[in-house]
Amino acid sequence: MELPASTAPSGISIENVAKTYPARKGSAEVVALDNINLNVPEGSIVGVIGRSGAGKSSLIRLINGLEQPTKGRVIVNGTEITSLDEPALRQARRSIGMIFQHFNLLSSRTAFDNIALPLEIAGVAKREIAKTVLPLLDMVGLADKRDRYPAELSGGQKQRVGIARALATSPKVLLSDEATSALDPETTDQILELLKRINADLRLTILFITHEMAVVKALADRVAVLERGHIVEEGTTYNVFASPQHEVTKRFVSSVTGSQAPDWLLARLKAERGPQDEAVLRISFRGSDAGQPLLSQIARSFGIDINILNGQVEMIAGHPFGTLIVSIPAEPELVGQVSNQLKAAGSAVEHLGYVA
């Protein structure tokens, strides 16, 4: 099913944006965002991840024009949102859909009527409203729930109504504010699959904010990591997962991959080498290397035993990525040679310490 598409250019461009909130009652001013530059290409899915207080909510409020930046420009669908007066901004928002963490449905309206609300506000005739709402109910899998009230729907069904409502005005851009945070893991997966299908079917540009790296891994083409009002890392989802550079990014990535050392190993890990200790290495395999027998080749080449302590291989953005934590004999020359051979094969290697 395909909804009518706007001919306006799609995508989001955030240029040198800062947002500072003034001091209140003796407290210092708050710098929520500082020199933010971010491009969301047409038809892409971009995730912005950050901890609480990183500036995510401020960013999304600037994109939909709910707040003005202290400096910089926000361009959505070819229109500079930050330069519009209120009537023009209301019109521009029709091309921007929004879904929320807590659904924001009207309890006195049925699923059909909640989806119809933005069309009613826009003055669309009732006959035309039905032509839009019924296909949307079908798209989100709620054709049989059109007359149900929010209290009669599950959390996942409420979010599906919210998604359909966001699509009612045929937007070119969809903003998602922690849309899966209130859902259980199974329902989260279903909503993410729905968003991916909508992105593909409608060529919809999606920007979502989240604090969950698993959501980024499942949904995003690209990711930007926000920390204390700054974008500290940005890139394709695969590259950010495979080779995180910033410490905040590394913590996010380790929470959903096998790159984090298990607690039992951390409890035994030592910084200094003892006489009977082995060196502990963390090895990341990218792309086709994730399926290659590199460790067995190295074990034969150097005549050593390699003990696998932890790890996994998974798919990220359609590409295999593997992480293994291993121990090998701790002679410095040997550790260096093994590390160099792994790096020459395209793997990333980190020496974590020593273990008895």
Swiss-Prot record:
List the GO terms this entry assigns under cellular component, sorted alphabetically.
Answer: plasma membrane
Entry EC no(s): 7.4.2.11
Catalytic reaction list: L-methionine(out) + ATP + H2O = L-methionine(in) + ADP + phosphate + H(+); D-methionine(out) + ATP + H2O = D-methionine(in) + ADP + phosphate + H(+)
One Pfam entry name: NIL
Is Ligase given among the entry's keywords?
no
Which terms are listed as keywords in the entry? Amino-acid transport, ATP-binding, Cell inner membrane, Cell membrane, Membrane, Nucleotide-binding, Translocase, Transport
Q: Which residues make up the binding site for ATP? A: 50-57
Topological relation to the membrane, as annotated: Peripheral membrane protein
**Where, if anywhere, are coiled coils annotated?**
none
**Domain ABC transporter, first and last residues per copy:** 12-253
Where in or outside the cell it occurs: the entry states: Cell inner membrane
- Which Gene Ontology molecular function entries are recorded, alphabetically? ABC-type D-methionine transporter activity; ATP binding; ATP hydrolysis activity
InterPro entries linked: AAA+_ATPase, ABC_transporter-like_ATP-bd, ABC_transporter-like_CS, ACT-like_dom_sf, MetN_ABC, MetN_ABC_transporter-like, NIL_domain, P-loop_NTPase
Instruction: Share what the entry says about its subunit structure, partners included.
Output: The complex is composed of two ATP-binding proteins (MetN), two transmembrane proteins (MetI) and a solute-binding protein (MetQ).
Identify its protein family: Belongs to the ABC transporter superfamily. Methionine importer (TC 3.A.1.24) family.
Q: What does this protein do?
A: Part of the ABC transporter complex MetNIQ involved in methionine import. Responsible for energy coupling to the transport system.
Protein name (database record): Methionine import ATP-binding protein MetN
What organism does the UniProt record list as the source?
Answer: Rhodopseudomonas palustris (strain BisB18)
